[in-house]
């Protein structure tokens, strides 16, 4: 009985995500990835000339500054990019 209880506890810990992990969309929003530790922002990168089509999406630790050619949009909730 103790073994069964211990097994259930271990399975619960493995199945539940005890630490917070962020999920960010990949280039195609149907797919996402779980961000590694330390990367706590999702980002979407656009070319300034065409803001409708994102060039890149993913996980990042610090939101980069926008430039004359590239614009970044960062957020910190699951699949927000």
UniProtKB/Swiss-Prot annotation:
GO MF terms held by the record: toxin activity
Major localization listed first in the record, in broad terms: secreted
Protein name, as recorded: Cytotoxin 5
Oligomeric and partner information: Monomer in solution; Homodimer and oligomer in the presence of negatively charged lipids forming a pore with a size ranging between 20 and 30 Angstroms.
SS bond partners: 24-42, 35-59, 63-74, 75-80
Family of the protein in this entry: Belongs to the three-finger toxin family. Short-chain subfamily. Type IA cytotoxin sub-subfamily.
GO cellular component: extracellular region; membrane; other organism cell membrane
Tissue distribution of the protein: Expressed by the venom gland.
Organism for this UniProt entry: Naja atra (Chinese cobra)
Function: Shows cytolytic activity on many different cells by forming pore in lipid membranes. In vivo, increases heart rate or kills the animal by cardiac arrest. In addition, it binds to heparin with high affinity, interacts with Kv channel-interacting protein 1 (KCNIP1) in a calcium-independent manner, and binds to integrin alpha-V/beta-3 (ITGAV/ITGB3) with moderate affinity.
Highest taxon of source: Eukaryota
Example GO biological process: killing of cells of another organism
Family matches, as InterPro entries: Cytotoxin_Cobra, Snake_3FTx, Snake_toxin-like_sf, Snake_toxin_con_site, Toxin_cobra-type
Localization, UniProt: Secreted; Target cell membrane
Keywords associated with the record: Cardiotoxin, Cytolysis, Disulfide bond, Membrane, Secreted, Signal, Target cell membrane, Target membrane, Toxin
Pfam families: Toxin_cobra-type
Signal peptide: 1-21
């Amino acid at each position: 009985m103790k073994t069964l209880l211990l097994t259930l506890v271990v399975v619960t810990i493995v199945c539940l995500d005890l630490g917070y992990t962020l999920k960010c969309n990949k280039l195609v929003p149907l797919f996402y990835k779980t961000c590694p530790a330390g990367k706590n922002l999702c980002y979407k990168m656009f070319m300034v000339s065409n803001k409708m089509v994102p060039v890149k999406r993913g996980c990042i630790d610090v939101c980069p500054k926008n430039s004359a050619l590239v614009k970044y949009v960062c957020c910190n909730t699951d699949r927000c990019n």
